[in-house]
Structures are given as structure tokens and as C-alpha cells.
């Protein structure tokens, strides 16, 4: 009987702590402004700068999903973590690359094909800063991410448009976190990032639609590399946006023979119109981009990360 009471008390205590954690998360989401004061916290094991002056960006083949690993010297960053079924595979792959810690991990928005494996990432790596938009979801996938953050005692950072931070030599600017607080489409709440390294810049669009793209047209968005928004769907990559960005390269993260028909001919036609060289994970597997000075090179490997 005593053991039963202890177990009940333990369960109640765990539930109370979990409920308290969700209150803390809610206060952070409602309050905002947490990002700027806590960002750029140094990695616990951060060492010397990038001696090779070379940045590596892995567009990891996770099928119809996104996961991007950035290695800048001894500092690591992850943007998205694929679907729920990709988590353990991503952990294994990233560990094979020698990754143990992320200075930044970003869940661009609360859709399963972007944060599905993030709970596994949080549980298996040291996360110094976790970035996510203010807009939340009631999905089990999103709850799993919050539970993992709770378990590891990592408080999320809620970025605002215009926020800036650095990895090692690479600098980042938050270009968008949504059109308004009333956004109903989670895609449009994507954390859109501009990365600058030496003489090269890259745009990471998440799943942002043409509506978000239109809001960016008056900003400094001309970049050599574009991570094409929303897997190359017809809802992103408008003619005016591609014309303004003027990318030399477009990376499309997409699953082979996916049911959505991504990338669409509309998107491919626009990219072709502006002479954008396209790299696709469904055709090339994991794509590794190397940046050194103003030189950009690509190689691809069949990682089978998506099973």
C-alpha cells in the first residue's frame, strides 16, 4: 500500500513539474523578447575558429522533409530534423560526422516534416540554443519536442524579425517569423534565415509561401544560394521573388516520387527562367555545399538517411 502511494505521489509530482514547464513555455511564447538576451550564448565546448576558412552545409536527404546541418569551424547548427521516423537515423548520421553539440538548433515551424525528429536530436545532443516560432501546434509531434526540451531543461528562444546571431564566422539574420500574429498557416510562420559567410550568402526559407516572399522583396535578399521554400511547391518561389534574390543555386529538399508532385513544373520553370542551377535531394541524395571565400562547390552522397 505504501509503495502504491509513493508511485501515485511520484506520478503527481512528475505531472506537476510537466505542467509547470508548459506554463514557463507559455510565458516565453506570450512575452517574446527572450531571444535577443539569451542568444549567442557560447557553446560549452567551443574551441578555435575555422582554421580552413571553409563552411560546410549538409542538405540531408530525409525524403519529403527538411534537415540541414551547418558546420562552421568547431560550431554546429541544425535547421529542422525531418519526419518522426527520421529521428534515430539523423542521430546516427550526425554522430558519424563527429557531432556532439549544437550551438543552435532551429525548428523552423511546427509541422511534422520539419520537427518530427527534433525530440531525438534534443535528447541525444547538447543544445545551447533552441529556436522556434511563436506559433504553436496541438500535435503530438510538437508536444514531443516540448517534452524533450523539458527533459533536457532547454528553454526555447523565440526569435523576432531582425534578430542577428553568429555561429563561428558565419552570421545569421532572421528575415521573417510570420506575416502577422494572426497567421493560421504554420508554413508562413517559418523562421526564415539569411546566412552570410565571407562573400557568400544563403537563404533558408523553411516552408514560407509567396505571401512571406512578397514581404521580403524590399529587404537585402540577393543571395547566391537559395534553399527553395516548401519543397518546390507551387505556393512558393514566385517569379518576382526569384528575380529579386538572383540565386545562382537552388536546393530543393524533396522525396522521390512524392504524392504532392513536388517540385512542381511551375517552380522549376521559374528557376530555369532565371538560370538557377538546381540541386535536388530526391535525385542526388544528401547534398554537401562547401563555401570558401566566393567559391561555392557541391558534392552529393547517398546516405539513405530517410530509410
Show where each model-derived region lies.
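Non-globular, low-confidence helical/coil segments that flank catalytic cores
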Residues: 2-307
